[in-house]
């Protein structure tokens, strides 16, 4: 159990520049491998797709790793702020995961429990704070960010070829349609 007074509150600085892609990274609480199972990964992919439709943003690349997620998104409207996108992605996954753990693996909840000084208790799925957020303001940088995202499972030794990792957009960029989530292919500067 973690006491809230023992935790330094992390804050993500966000610059919601209209017409600017965002490279986002966020992690599981205490870097626990909470995204190692297909069930939880599918919840995340479902949440990505729902948030994309709700907040009107393009998803150019993603990868789901066992304890963190990388995204490259492009907001199509001023309403698609980073805070809204992240809440729309993270909240449904956390709620489903905590409910599932309560019903099936309650011992795991202890690792995710945080007690506030007031005595209020909560269970964390995601690391506190928003994670990493960078505006990608140069079009020439976008393909490099996509490649970096796709190579995560290769660098970790989970696969030898990026497109072999099913929880990534790498296979989509190779032209495969049998993917977990179809992304909005980056084909140069947005119109």
Predicted regions mapped to residue ranges:
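Short catalytic/metal-binding and nucleic-acid-binding patches
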Residues: 1-191
């Amino acid at each position: 159990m973690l006491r809230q007074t023992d935790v330094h509150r992390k804050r993500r600085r966000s610059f919601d520049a209209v017409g600017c892609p965002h490279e986002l990274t966020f992690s599981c609480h205490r870097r626990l491998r909470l995204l190692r199972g297909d069930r939880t990964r599918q919840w995340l992919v479902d949440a990505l797709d729902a948030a994309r439709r709700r907040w009107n943003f393009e998803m150019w690349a993603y990868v789901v790793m066992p304890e963190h997620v990388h995204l490259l998104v492009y907001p199509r409207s001023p309403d698609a702020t980073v805070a809204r996108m992240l809440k729309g992605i993270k909240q449904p996954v956390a709620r489903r995961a905590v409910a599932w753990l309560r019903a099936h693996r309650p011992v795991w909840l202890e690792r995710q429990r945080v007690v506030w000084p007031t005595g209020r208790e909560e269970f964390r799925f995601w690391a506190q704070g928003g994670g990493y957020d960078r505006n990608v303001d140069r079009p020439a940088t976008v393909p490099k960010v996509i490649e970096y995202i796709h190579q995560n499972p290769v660098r970790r030794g989970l696969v030898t070829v990026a497109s072999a990792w099913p929880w990534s957009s790498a296979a989509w960029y190779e032209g495969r349609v049998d993917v977990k989530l179809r992304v909005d292919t980056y084909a140069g500067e947005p119109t």
